[in-house]
Amino acid sequence: MSYAKEIIQQSIKDIKLQKSRARRRQIEKLLNYYTGTDTWKYISGKEGNYFDSASFNEVPPYNMNLTKKFIDKKSRIYTLSPNRDLGNKSANNQYKELLFYKNLRMKHIERMTNLVGTPAVRVMWEEDEGKKCFEYRVVYYYDAYFTPPNPYHPYAIIYPILNPTQEVDYTEPVEFAYWDDKVNIIYDEDGNIKEEYPNPYGVLPFVFPRDTEQIDDFYGEGSTDVVATNEHLNILMTELMLGLRFQMFGQSWASGVYEDQPIARVGSDKLINLPDGGRFGIESPGGDPQKVLEIAKG
C-alpha cells in the first residue's frame, strides 16, 4: 500500500475516533444534566469556563434541573399501561407474563430516547427464580457498524460495560462488549478478549428507538436544546446570586494606604485604622436583579 493511501486511511480513522469521543462527551453531558450530576463543571471547569473559580468562594453555582422536568413531562406515552390483546384470555395471560418488565422499562426507554436521541436497547431473555420473561436494558453510548449499502440498520455494536466503580476495592480495567448476529465478545481496554460466546438469538439483539426519522446521521441529536437552555439558566442565576451578594455587601475600596498592609473585609464591630490622608469606602454595583428574573422567566 502506498504512503498516500496509508495517510488517507489513518486520517479517516482519526476523524472517526474524534467524532466518537465527541459524541460520548455530548451524551455524558445530556445524562449529567438529566441526573443533576456535576453540572457545575460545564459553567466553571474544563468543560466551560464562564466563571473564575474564586467566584464560587462567594456563592455556590446554581443548579436547576430543568432537563429532567422537561424530559419527564414530554415522555407521556407510557403514562398509562397499554392494552395488549392477542385475541383470547389464555394467550393474553401468557404474553403478560413474558412482558413482566416491559411497561416499566419502556417508560425509561421513552425518556432516554427523548434525551439522547437514539439509544440502543438490548432485548434479552431472563430466567430468574422460576420467572421467564423478556428484559430490556438501555445502552446510552455505543458505536454502531454498518455495511456500505445500508446506513440504516447496524450489523454490529460495541459499547462500554457498566462497572461497579464505586466499590473501593474494584480496580479492574474498563471492559467492552461486542455483538453481531453470530457472536458476543467481552474484551478489555487493551483489546484482550476475556470471554466469547455464540449469539443465542441469531440476530443482533438490539433495537434503536428514535423520536425523529433518520436524516443525515444514524445517531439522533437528542435534547441538546433543552440542556443548552438549562445551562444558560444556571449561568444567569449564578450571575444573579453574585450580583445580589455584591449589592448587599458592596465592594470595599481604599486609597492612601500602604501596599504591604491591605485592608481585608471585616465585621461591623471592628475598627479600621487608616493612615493620614487615607480613605475607605464601599461601592454597590449597578444592575437591576428584577430585570434578570424577568429574563429568566421569559
Each predicted region: which residue ranges?
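Extended hydrophobic/Leu-rich segments
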Residues: A4-I8, L31-Y34, I43, F51, ...
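Extended, helix-rich architectural segments
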Residues: M1-C133
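Extended, regular secondary-structure scaffolds
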Residues: M106-D216
